[in-house]
Amino acid sequence: FPNFFRRLTAEGAFTVAFVPTFSRLLQDKGKKDALEFAEEVISIMGIGLFLFSFFVIIFMPTFMLGLAPGFIEQDWLFDLTVELARITFIYLTPISLVALLGGILNSFGKFGAMASAPILLNIILIVSLVFFENSMETKGPVLAIAVAISGVAQFIWLLEACRQHGSIRKLR
């Protein structure tokens, strides 16, 4: 469920439109104007996605009735699905912003941070499974939390790379 929205925001039309616009501003108006545009877009998108995610997380049972109506017949399965979807939906906001930050860095010819960001997901998933190997009957909640944490970690990673490069001064 969160991956559907991630594809729309992080890999979909929004990012496809953002990168050429940012690159054109960078070329035509200069770094200052392009970065002001990027900072505004990131701030607006971050707030919008946070509010959207908050709404979806609150009303996740209703969404799950539409997405997985057969699960309602087994209370435990429906409850687990809602719980895991709520946790993993946290991933949407930071990973969508990661795509924008990566697009900014890529526009400057800086590819390393974005290319290495998915490694954080793998490391966090592996470490969480090793660390919590014997503490839970099912690994689903551990992996869901690890996915959410990895989204935040990737966002911090890319934000720091942008700051070191001088691509992001502040979020508006």
Language-model segments: residues:
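Membrane-embedded alpha-helical bundles of multi-pass transporters/translocases
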Residues: F1-R172
